[in-house]
């Protein structure tokens, strides 16, 4: 009798534990069908969309943004982006690019390397799959290399669509948010996904990734800083209130913020967003085949490449005229961007000189706050890809405020340096090239590149083989 009671009690405890675990952090989906993250799995079902997605692989060339603008090496001194920052390529390369960047370094096992698991979060439909299977804590916990063999398929179908729904299986879009942290963010700004209009949903699925975010808690989980809103001021206020910083600047020791790519936020504030012109209208237009079939072109790209299907739907001006307008705005934004950079770079070096001259934390605190705010505003504008087209007025206003904050910092620094007996201009080292700027910071680029090469040659092939074996066991062959 006692043994029977013990067995029943153990079974009951196990059942309760199972229920608690399954309800924790979105741990298990109510759906019994496993999500298939392989984009090729939908090639027949959505042939037009798949065949138009594949050419996102055409953007083979890697453009080095640091080589183009070495100021950014100094602006991100002490942070991973000073090592390596390339311009965005097509979705097809999402996995390759995050593996190959120096920012993820060269982990030798699942517990090494500088980056958290969160760095996969916008790279693959495997992320949503793993969250379903292991819960949010199960996904986010640990280092980036921990699930390298699990995160294998580049950005694609199951990132933005409910691929298991009858709507999708019958040829419909079935737009979906596939990550719980995005659902919470949309709720925070009063836009629950299920209540959104079709147009808003088309923007929100892009807003799963083309946004500002940060890592929080023990697991370094992704969170969008939208609790107070999505403008540059509202997010700055949020970060200041919680005392968050991404890193401490190597030169100035300022507690810095690294804007990611707040395209969704700046789009909302710009003329296109306010007029409900959404991402797909310009970057994934509806096109018509010769047989009259209409479908959404999934080769995300420049609207000028498909002018008649994009811009011409709203604008009466010629392609040449609109291109000239956009080029002019881009030049204006670039000019203000470089102006802000020169001021902020100088502020970092002047702050470093103030520390060297014996400045105290109390003396430096308001100066470092100005530098933090200046660079946050600069980064918010320049990290939002295409802001010169999405919201040029937002870019110019925000960059103007970055210049103002940097000027505030430098004015205070002039007084503080004079107080310490320094009245000559602070010398800035040679930062005319990417290599020179990295050298000025004492960065061992050869060592980093060798470490990355070893990782790509030894660790990544094992990941790929393990993934191949797992997918062969879990899914039907393609």
Swiss-Prot record:
Residue numbers binding heme c 5: 272, 311, 314-315
Essential cofactor(s): Ca(2+); heme c
Listed SUPFAM superfamilies: Multiheme cytochromes (SSF48695)
Pfam families, sorted: Cytochrom_C552
Binding-site residues for heme c 3, renumbered to this chain: 91, 206, 209-210
Metabolic or biological pathway, per its Swiss-Prot or TrEMBL entry: Nitrogen metabolism; nitrate reduction (assimilation)
Residues reported in the UniProt entry to bind heme c 4: 279, 282-283, 390
Cofactor: how bound: Binds 1 Ca(2+) ion per monomer. Binds 5 heme c groups covalently per monomer.
Leader peptide range in chain numbering: 1-27
A GO molecular-function annotation: calcium ion binding
Keywords, ordered alphabetically: Calcium, Electron transport, Heme, Iron, Metal-binding, Oxidoreductase, Periplasm, Signal, Transport
GO cellular component: outer membrane-bounded periplasmic space
Membrane spanning stretches: none
Positions contributing to Ca(2+) binding: 212-213, 258, 260
InterPro entries found in the cross-reference section: Cyt_c552, Cyt_c_NO2Rdtase_formate-dep, Multihaem_cyt_sf
Compartment(s): Periplasm
E.C. designation(s): 1.7.2.2
Binding site for substrate: 213, 261
Catalytic activity reported: 6 Fe(III)-[cytochrome c] + NH4(+) + 2 H2O = 6 Fe(II)-[cytochrome c] + nitrite + 8 H(+)
Main location as per UniProt: periplasm
NCBIfam families, A to Z: cyto_c552_HCOOH (TIGR03152), PRK11125.1 (NF008339)
Function: Catalyzes the reduction of nitrite to ammonia, consuming six electrons in the process.
Family of this protein: Belongs to the cytochrome c-552 family.
Protein name stated in the entry: Cytochrome c-552
Lineage of the organism: Bacteria, Pseudomonadati, Pseudomonadota, Gammaproteobacteria, Vibrionales
Gene: nrfA
């Amino acid at each position: 009798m006692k043994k029977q009671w013990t067995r029943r009690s153990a079974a009951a405890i196990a059942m309760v534990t199972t229920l608690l675990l399954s309800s924790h952090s979105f741990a298990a989906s109510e759906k019994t069908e496993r999500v298939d993250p392989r984009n090729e799995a939908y090639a027949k079902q959505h042939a037009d969309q798949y065949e138009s997605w594949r050419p996102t692989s055409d953007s083979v060339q890697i453009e080095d943004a640091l080589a183009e603008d070495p100021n950014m090496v100094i602006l991100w001194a002490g942070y991973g982006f000073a090592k390596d920052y390339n311009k965005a390529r097509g979705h097809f390369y999402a996995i390759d690019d995050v593996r190959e960047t120096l920012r993820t370094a060269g982990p030798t096992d699942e517990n090494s390397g500088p980056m958290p698991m969160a760095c996969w979060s916008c790279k693959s439909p495997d992320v949503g799959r793993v969250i379903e299977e292991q819960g949010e804590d199960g996904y986010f916990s640990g280092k980036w290399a921990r699930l390298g063999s699990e995160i294998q398929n580049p950005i694609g179908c199951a990132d933005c669509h409910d691929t298991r729904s009858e709507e999708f299986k019958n040829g419909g879009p079935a737009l979906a948010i596939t990550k719980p942290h995005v659902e919470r963010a949309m709720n925070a700004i009063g836009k629950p996904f299920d209540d959104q209009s079709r147009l808003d949903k088309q923007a929100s699925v892009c807003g799963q990734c083309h946004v500002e975010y940060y890592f929080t808690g023990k697991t370094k989980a992704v969170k969008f800083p939208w609790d107070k809103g999505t403008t540059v001021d509202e997010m700055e206020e949020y970060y200041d209130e919680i005392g968050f910083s991404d890193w401490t600047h190597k030169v100035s020791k300022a507690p810095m913020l690294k804007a990611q790519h707040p395209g969704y936020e700046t789009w909302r504030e710009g003329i296109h967003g306010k007029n409900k012109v959404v991402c797909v209208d310009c970057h994934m237009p509806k096109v018509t085949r010769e047989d009259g079939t209409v479908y959404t072109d999934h080769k995300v790209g420049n609207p000028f490449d498909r002018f008649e299907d994009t811009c011409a739907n709203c604008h009466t001006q010629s392609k040449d005229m609109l291109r000239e307008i956009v080029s002019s705005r881009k030049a204006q934004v670039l000019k203000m961007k470089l102006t802000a950079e020169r001021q902020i770079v100088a502020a970092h070096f002047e702050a470093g000189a103030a520390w060297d001259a014996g400045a105290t934390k109390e003396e430096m605190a308001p100066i470092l706050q100005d530098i933090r705010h200046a660079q946050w505003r600069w980064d918010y504008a320049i990290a939002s890809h295409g802001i010169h087209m999405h919201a040029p007025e937002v870019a110019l206003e925000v960059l103007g405020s970055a210049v103002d904050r940097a000027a505030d910092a430098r004015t205070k620094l002039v007084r503080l340096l004079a107080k310490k007996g320094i009245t000559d201009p602070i010398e800035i080292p040679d930062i005319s090239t990417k290599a020179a700027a990295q050298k000025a910071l004492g960065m061992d680029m050869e060592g980093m590149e060798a470490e990355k090469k070893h990782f790509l040659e030894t660790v990544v092939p094992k990941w790929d083989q393990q993934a191949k074996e797992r997918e062969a066991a879990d899914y039907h062959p393609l």
